[in-house]
Amino acid sequence: MKKYVMALDQGTTSSRAILFDYEGKIVATSQKEFTQIYPKAGWVEHDPMEIWGTQSGVAREVLERMAISPQDIAAIGITNQRETTIVWDKNTGKPVYNAIVWQCRRTAAICDELKTQGMADYIRENTGLVLDAYFSGTKIKWILDHVEGAKEKAEKGELLFGTVDSWLIWNLTRGKVHVTDYSNASRTMLYNIKQLKWDDKILKALEIPKSMLPEVKESSAIYGYTDHQTFGGADIPIAGAAGDQQAALFGQGCFKEGMGKNTYGTGCFMLMNTGDQFVQSKNGLLTTLAWGIDGKVEYALEGSIFVAGASVQWLRDELKIIRDAEDTEYLAKKVPNSNGVYVVPAFTGMGAPYWDMYARGAIVGLTRGAKAEHIIRATLESIAYQTRDVLEAMEQDSGIQLKSLKVDGGAAMNNFLMQFQADILSVPVDRPKITETTALGAAYLAGLAVGFWKDKNEIESKWSVDTVFEPGMDHEEKERLYKGWKRAVNRALKWEEENELDVK
């Protein structure tokens, strides 16, 4: 009997490998950060070879550290930063350009051009996404247009595109398998999530040859086996894949319509399961595929907040007013409130429900009495306010009122933030015992495909709560604070656009 399932969690700032046992408990974990490349303002890249190097490295390391044989691994599940775009040469396996990361804004002008062609409504109605630089489609076009010879090679069928899951599976199988899953495909802005196929009209508008695209499969299925050289001769089935947020929804056991979770990572991502219903948002949310499993797909509504944990990194690395992310909880509690200060961390624009590529960060409400602690507290509070923005939009779209919010991700360990979140939402916030739900979701998807776990009911029974944060704030106080947030956001919207007009 095989004892473990390995999750490869390829994130925005690090690659991790986590081993789970049958109970869904973490046995071992290994992590390695990699380089963030910022060639110009608003541009973000990663080196695809470094993504593969760090990811394969931690996978081997986690086995070696625990002296576990690769033969004991029942399956590998992959979860990944979504939308990040890699184009590589089919014959050499070498990328033709760096990975263009989901946060990168370089293709805003391509999006504007598509809008003038009248593509925005078509894209929203068929891919569930808003026309934005965030998604893979325009990033592929940028690579084909700007890398010498890329367009010609693509037309000859010599280039392949993949999101990070595809790139890892391609490398794990030494180029034998070029696939993605429904959840990742639904983030490319090229996939028709009603018809479940690549959309010819969008491909034509972006001049992307279909031959570049991976085959789309269920999120829980055996895609292929690890190449002999990867894990010392072991043929481990690669049996699950899902974009990080959909994987977290699965790992949290949100299998029923109306169940939702928020992941507090670099960005913040809130998803609500809408079952087999494609719910078209009227409030700037995305409609996305949650997963494909057991021969059918399920949909979700998603609100993306671009900057959450990244604003805490900014306090640490740029402002240098904290030494460690963990310090924020203690420092935020040193003051009774934010002293009227609001931080709007729109460093790369604003996501749902605003979708403003030209918004920029702002700190408002400063007085002479504003201290570092107030700015730290206001930064944490901004994460909770943005979550409320998204939740209100979700409830309006779906007609479902959330009873409680399941939370995970690094910042979910911050008790101050979780309590403030419950207060500002007026719903209980449930933090599970295992907060590594993204990796857990990938492990569950892979384990189900190979029979390591029987079905979703068995998985659901393993979810257990660690802490419930009950709302306790006075209604008037809560609404007063939230109104102030809305005023602060209005100061930050359209900032860059106005700046460009001034220059002209």
UniProtKB/Swiss-Prot annotation:
Sn-glycerol 3-phosphate binds at residues 12, 82-83, 134, 244. Activated by phosphorylation and inhibited by fructose 1,6-bisphosphate (FBP). It catalyses: glycerol + ATP = sn-glycerol 3-phosphate + ADP + H(+). Signal peptide: none annotated. Glycerol binds at residues 82-83, 134, 244-245. Pfam families: FGGY_C, FGGY_N. One of its GO terms (cellular component) is cytosol. ADP binds at residues 12, 16, 266, 309, 410, 414. PANTHER family: GLYCEROL KINASE, SUGAR KINASE. This is Glycerol kinase. It comes from Alkaliphilus oremlandii (strain OhILAs) (Clostridium oremlandii (strain OhILAs)).
